[in-house]
Amino acid sequence: MIVRSTIVRGAMRFSGVHFLDFQRLGLRIALLAAIALATAPLNLAAAQTQAPALWTVPEVGALPNDAFGSQIRRGRDLVTATYALIGPEVPDQTKRFAGNNLACSNCHLQAGTKKFGLPIFGLFELFPQYSARRGAEITIVDRVNSCMVRSMNGRELPNDSPEMQAIVAYIRFLSSGVAQGQIVPGLGAGAMPELKRAADPVRGRAVYVKSCLACHNTDGSGIRRSLPTTDLGYMMPPLWGPDSFNDGAGMARLITAANFVHFNMPHGADYLNPQLTVEQAWDVAAYLISQPRPKKAGLEKDFPDLLQKPVDTPYGPYADGFSEQQHKYGPFAPIRAAIARAKKKQ
């Protein structure tokens, strides 16, 4: 009753109408409509992403201190402190698998458990799956190693290595209770409306200076945990430069980067409370991907079926006749239309 009376008073304030009788069905419907309008999201992008169902993420801290629990905790540590365990500066040179001092959790936020923060929660049961980039079916091990050579700019972990086994165990643990093939709402980076124009790195620089520079530095180099070395990783990760992800990483693609930024940045933002507008997110992501970063060899071999190549892949070859510039910054609707026409001719 308290909630109802509070809502009614709020609705009366918004509508400016004095209701004398709430028992009649017609007025009840009108009241509910007024409440819905008054509390509707004001941000278009937030409205575009459906609120996912409640997640029940298993608690790593509740695991027993046995071999099973230790392996999963080790996997979580490899996700959150990658640089300290398999980074390029660890004392044991045989363990230097990552080529930069990032952590997996710089992209897979909150140790892979944040909705629309590129979570790894619920992913295990989606594998094996077909990979357009490989042109073949891949396992969860293949997917982890794809991140190792692209986002971590390093080399593959051996399939039977303790590190790979621990990471896979952690991903499996996070998927506890998720059915095989179930796609959990909240995966990925979200989906906001696309621009009808190309995303603009020049406009994006202004957004970066205002909203990103304080954490990620003027030159995108981030904030290190220790000076002058990077052996303890970063408080705030580098967004470009030699210690960042390479140009074959998913975050080097505009659609992924823009949605990730919109639903997660600046710090404190989420899919319910984005802090940047849709245009700001697209433009600042364009600025980010326009900056120099490590080059991955062999990118021309990605996506053997070029008609399955994502429209925002920033490197050729292409099968649609559009330039690398448009693939990198958009607009993407004309590219999608051309690909659809080409597929119909197959």
What function would you assign to each model-found segment?
Residues 67-111, 196-236, 257:
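Sequence/structural segment immediately N-terminal to covalent heme-attachment motifs in c-type
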Residues 2-3, 19-20, 29-86, 129-201, ...:
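Post-cleavage N-terminal segment of exported redox proteins
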Residues 300-339:
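Conserved non-transmembrane functional hotspots
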Residues 85-94, 155-160, 180-184, 272-275, ...:
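Surface-exposed patches in mature extracellular/periplasmic domains of secreted proteins
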Residues 6-30:
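Bacterial N-terminal signal peptides that target proteins for export
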Residues 91-95, 122-126, 184-192, 241-242:
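Short linear capping/connector segments at secondary-structure termini
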Residues 69-73, 78-86, 106-157, 167, ...:
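Extracytoplasmic electron-transfer domains, predominantly the class I c-type cytochrome c fold
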